[in-house]
């Protein structure tokens, strides 16, 4: 089991639920939480990818609320894997939920470089400021 070995070294492990088109193993936050409950260690957390969550969750904010302190990292992406703001996801409740569960970790952009990498990066920065730092 990697969990206890990593814990000895102070290294967290992240489990990312993926959408049903990529795997049939762990698709939702609830699936991930069920697996975490079976582990002997507490240093395994969920990597919550907002793109995958848009496909699988009834409510992205609700799933994040359910995960609570088990959120170890967030992939900040819109419904179409483009920069936040270039899809249809409503990020205000997601940002509010992350704040309400006390998440203070990183949000990384795992996005497509569309319409080009410079504009995708600029949109990501703008959206991060709008929803996370200024929220």
Task: List the predicted regions and their residue ranges.
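Active-site acidic/histidine proton-transfer and metal-coordination neighborhood
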Residues: 1-45
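Histidine-acidic metal/acid-base catalytic patches
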Residues: 26-48, 52-135
């Amino acid at each position: 089991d990697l969990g206890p070995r990593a814990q000895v070294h102070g290294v967290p492990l992240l489990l990312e639920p993926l959408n049903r088109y990529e795997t049939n193993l762990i698709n939702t936050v609830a699936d991930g939480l069920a697996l975490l409950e079976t582990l002997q260690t507490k240093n395994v957390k969920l990597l919550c990818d907002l793109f995958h969550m848009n496909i699988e969750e009834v409510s992205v904010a609700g799933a994040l609320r359910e995960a609570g302190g088990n959120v170890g990292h967030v992939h900040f992406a819109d419904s179409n894997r483009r920069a936040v703001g270039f899809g249809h996801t409503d990020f205000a409740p997601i940002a509010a939920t992350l704040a309400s569960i006390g998440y203070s970790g990183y949000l990384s952009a795992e996005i497509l470089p569309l319409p080009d990498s410079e504009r995708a990066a600029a949109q990501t920065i703008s959206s991060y400021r709008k929803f996370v730092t200024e929220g």
